């Protein structure tokens, strides 16, 4: 019995040793897999990475898109998104004539990939929040202060170009690239807007009054010309009647011819006496006039 117990103990010890070896192998394999996984990192498209070393600090190497290796627990990557991202910034500021202006700005910004190490040391990874609001407000206040409120409306394109140029140059001081800068909003205080509207209404009323005055002058001139023409016509007609008694008879004949032509072209048959045609053929004056015309 004692021998059987000893043999059983030996078998149990051997089995335990075998199980321990198996567990050790599994643990070693798991650690190896974990180590390999931790030694690799991927840089996605549109991103760049820099490496921090626990011993030497930041490395100047720049890691582009793709799969890269590192020393686990000693090195870890810092990945930056270098794609342009939109930022909306609004700033209340004052114009040259001390009018309050609310300006909205849309900025497409991205970090300079060649200076990611310096950006991380000075600004960290939230560089947009640290830089863009301050420099945008600074540039907007400086540019808007050069223009009157009315010039901000009439010269908006020039204002936008000046803001763009100044802001791009200012952002380069922080190694930030601005791909686009555009004014999206330009609003004034309610009091100024009401004053501008009243001024426009007054200008329209003045233009309307000027139009009415010019039209009245033209109508007056037309009446003067018409009256002068009628007076000249009456004068000539009077002289003709005075110098030639048959002139009136001739006008009667022409009027009668016109009436006769109209009546003849009508579908209705109408008979008019000579008196109805303003003619009196039996009149001796008529005969004398016709003889003279012959």
Curated annotation (Swiss-Prot):
GO terms for molecular function: protein homodimerization activity. GO terms for cellular component: cell surface; mitochondrial inner membrane; mitochondrial membrane; mitochondrial prohibitin complex; mitochondrion; plasma membrane. High molecular weight complex that consist of phb-1 and phb-2. Residues 212-237 form a coiled coil. Pfam families: Band_7. PHB proteins are essential during embryonic development and are required for somatic and germline differentiation in the larval gonad. A deficiency in PHB proteins results in altered mitochondrial biogenesis in body wall muscle cells. Required for clearance of paternal mitochondria after embryonic fertilization. Gene3D superfamilies: Band 7 domain. The keyword Coiled coil applies. It is a single-pass type II membrane protein. SUPFAM superfamilies: Band 7/SPFH domain. The keyword DNA damage does not apply. The gene is phb-2. Belongs to the prohibitin family. GO terms for biological process: defecation; embryo development ending in birth or egg hatching; gonad development; mitochondrion organization; mitophagy; oogenesis; positive regulation of multicellular organism growth; protein stabilization. Its main location: mitochondrion. This is Mitochondrial prohibitin complex protein 2. It is found in: Mitochondrion inner membrane. InterPro entries: Band_7, Band_7/SPFH_dom_sf, Prohibitin.
